């Protein structure tokens, strides 16, 4: 059994199709078919339920998937350990929620000091980013409002104040709470805070409108479509320009902490260690939780 076979197997699982897996790997379809058949012959069992609609794992396939993920993760870690050196190089994939206002200064300081590292930044909501870290898809992530997890180490980066923003500058505060709530999809900590506040008010029936980017949410608020909550530091310039109005919300919902997380069992490459050091050396000192 070869590592390559396990990688091909995982791609077939991901796409549910030999042809799609082959295309993603730049292999001919017949080669992928042969490698899957070879794997099944070695294990003396079929791994998929096959139909005209695609390929779905059977119970034996699910078992192999679990172990293959661990094996490939360990191989990747081994390569990182062997290749790691005093001058970090290679790649680092970091996730972040969209509203980490202080992130650019951290990334800039890191890139200036370690220019050989290929740093990729992936944006998403907290719940998705946590899942990606747990599933080894990201080396680490900046997330908000997170709680302790046995497989994750987290560092507190900074605490921020959430505020409600609107362009309804002539409306009383009580009327604002019935305007549409402009939010990210489920899994966003800001959305959870806003919905929790609205829910606790009891008599509020606000419409929920989901958006994909913070830029779109802010543009919609400015256009008068609805209201949202956002870190005060992110919106201060727009407030100064007079295009939005800020309202304080109850302290129970206004405090939110940004943390940097990584898996507890992942080998800390020099690249990741130096990234954590850069976070700690930022004006807002990170501390391990």
Swiss-Prot record:
Q: Which residues form the signal peptide?
A: none
**Per its UniProt record, what Pfam families does this chain match?**
HTH_1 (PF00126), LysR_substrate (PF03466)
* DNA-binding region location: 18-37
Spell out where the chain crosses the membrane.
none
Q: Identify the residues that the record assigns to the HTH lysR-type domain, covering every copy.
A: 1-58
Q: Recite the UniProt keywords alphabetically.
A: DNA-binding, Repressor, Transcription, Transcription regulation
* UniProt xrefs under SUPFAM superfamilies: Periplasmic binding protein-like II, Winged helix' DNA-binding domain
Q: Does the keyword Repressor apply?
A: yes
Q: Which domain of life is it from?
A: Bacteria
> What PROSITE patterns is this protein classified in?
HTH_LYSR
Query: From the Swiss-Prot or TrEMBL record, what is one GO molecular function term?
Result: DNA-binding transcription factor activity
Keyword Transferase set for record: no
Q: What family does the database annotate?
A: Belongs to the LysR transcriptional regulatory family.
As for what it does, the entry says:
Transcriptional repressor of soxA gene expression.
Report what the protein is called: HTH-type transcriptional regulator SoxR
Q: Which organism is it from?
A: Arthrobacter sp. (strain TE1826)
């Amino acid at each position: 059994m070869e590592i390559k076979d396990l990688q091909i197997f995982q791609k077939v699982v991901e796409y549910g199709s030999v042809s799609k897996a082959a295309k993603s790997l730049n292999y001919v379809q017949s080669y992928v078919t042969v490698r899957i058949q070879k794997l099944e012959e070695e294990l003396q069992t079929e791994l998929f339920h096959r139909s005209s609609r695609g390929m779905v794992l059977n119970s034996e396939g699910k078992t192999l998937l679990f172990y293959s993920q661990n094996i490939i993760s360990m191989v990747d870690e081994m390569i990182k350990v062997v290749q790691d050196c005093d001058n970090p190089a290679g790649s680092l994939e970091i996730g972040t929620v969209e509203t980490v206002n202080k992130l650019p200064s951290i990334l800039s300081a890191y890139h200036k000091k370690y220019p050989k590292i290929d740093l990729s930044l992936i944006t998403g909501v907290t719940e998705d980013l946590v899942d990606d870290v747990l599933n080894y898809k990201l080396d680490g992530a900046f997330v908000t409002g997170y709680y302790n997890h046995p497989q994750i180490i987290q560092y507190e980066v900074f605490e921020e104040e959430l505020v409600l923003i609107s362009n309804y500058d002539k409306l009383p505060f009580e009327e604002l709470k019935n305007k549409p709530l402009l939010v990210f999809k489920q899994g966003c900590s800001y959305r959870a805070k806003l919905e929790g506040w609205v829910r606790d008010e009891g008599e509020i029936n606000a419409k929920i409108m989901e958006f994909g980017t913070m830029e779109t949410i802010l543009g919609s608020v400015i256009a008068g479509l609805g209201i949202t909550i956002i870190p005060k530091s992110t919106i201060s310039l727009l407030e100064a320009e007079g295009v939005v109005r800020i309202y304080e919300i109850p302290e129970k919902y206004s405090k939110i902490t940004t943390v940097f997380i990584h898996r507890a069992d992942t080998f800390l490459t020099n690249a990741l260690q130096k990234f954590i050091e850069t976070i700690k050396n930022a004006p807002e000192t990170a501390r391990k939780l």
